[in-house]
Amino acid sequence: MHEVSIMAEAVRLAMESARAAGAPRVTGLRLRVGSLSGAVPEALRFAWDVVRCETPAAEAWLEIESVPAACWCAKCRAEFACENGLSECPRCHEFSGDLRRGRELEIASVEVN
């Protein structure tokens, strides 16, 4: 379960942000997780509960923003929802491998106090 190592790193980075701000603890963390990132939001939440124990983030909340995958059709010059990195444009039926969103796995913000 790679979500544990992902969240361990997120906690480390959040605590680094708190130290840089001169704050004693992390009070919240917002993540952006793409539907094609390979990370499972429920597993990230479980891992969060495990890895934040006995850290300055022990009482912090976690918010996960799901980012749906979107591809770009060069022929139509339009973005469309897609299931994977190679999908058929619903307008012109050309296939596109130009994935614009969906692979995100990033810290959107850290709240400290």
For the regions a language model picked out, list residue spans one by one.
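Short loop/turn motifs enriched for small/polar and acidic residues
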Residues: R32-L36, E65-A69, V110
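Short microdomains enriched in Cys/His and/or Lys/Arg
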Residues: R91-N113
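Flanking scaffold residues of small Cys/His-coordinated metal-binding clusters
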Residues: V67-P68, E83-N84, G102
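Cys/His-rich microdomains that often coordinate metals
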Residues: E79-F80, S96
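Long, charged N-terminal interaction/targeting segments
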Residues: M1-E59
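Cys/His-enriched microdomains
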Residues: C71, S87, L105
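Generic structural signal for residues in well-ordered beta-strands
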Residues: E59-I64, G97
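Short cysteine-rich clusters marking metal-coordination/redox-active sites
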Residues: C73-C76, C89-C92
